[in-house]
Regions:
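Gly/Pro-rich active-site capping loops and adjacent beta-alpha segments
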Residues: 1-53, 121-169
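N-terminal leader/propeptide and maturation segments of large enzyme subunits in energy/redox metabolism
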Residues: 43-111
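Helix-loop-helix junctions that connect adjacent transmembrane helices in secondary transporters/permeases
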Residues: 82-153
């Protein structure tokens, strides 16, 4: 990873790249080396999901190539290998509350994956699909609590912060 002239968030980028490069798939054997390299360019700055987009594009491109080489539909290949509740991720963490299969099935239906693309009346030349996993530095569990106050009001406490991911209540 290009760290620029200063480390800033580069250690986080290197960690995220290593953790998420395997995608949301069941793998029995996996290894990643990830480095932040100092260069004479501006330092990398913060953004949501640093490194995740890079490794997702690379990994999901490989999934398509592998499925094609095996003569398999890329969606069916993903559905067969995607993580489900109780699976252990390559980091050793047992995964819970996963909905990748439902996500893929709903998306495939919603975008008309099995219909052909009208190339004569469109500037589209094809379509693709990708599935990602995002790491977090916080625990992977959260909690919500409602307190009934003495004045009759309720106070909602949640263990998340709204950073654009849709947790705003």
């Amino acid at each position: 990873w290009n760290a620029g002239a200063y480390s800033d968030t580069s250690p986080i980028v290197a960690k995220n790249g290593a953790i998420t490069c395997f995608g949301p798939y069941r793998l029995s054997h996996a290894w990643a080396d990830s480095y932040a390299i100092y260069t004479n360019l501006p330092p990398a700055g913060s953004y949501r999901g640093p490194a995740v987009l890079d490794v997702t594009w690379a990994g999901e491109s490989q999934i398509d190539i592998i499925a094609d080489e095996m003569g398999l539909d890329p969606i069916q290949f993903r559905l067969k290998n995607v993580l489900v509740d109780g699976d252990v991720y390559v980091t050793g963490e047992t995964m819970h509350d996963l909905h990748y299969k439902t996500l893929l099935e709903t998306t495939v239906k919603g975008i008309g994956w099995n219909t052909s693309v009208d190339r004569e009346n469109s500037n589209r030349t094809g379509r693709g699909i990708a599935v990602a996993i995002k790491s977090t530095t916080t625990p992977s569990t959260s909690k919500a609590e409602i307190r009934l106050e003495s004045d009759g009001c309720c106070t909602l406490l949640v263990s998340t912060v709204e950073l654009g991911q849709g947790s705003k209540i």
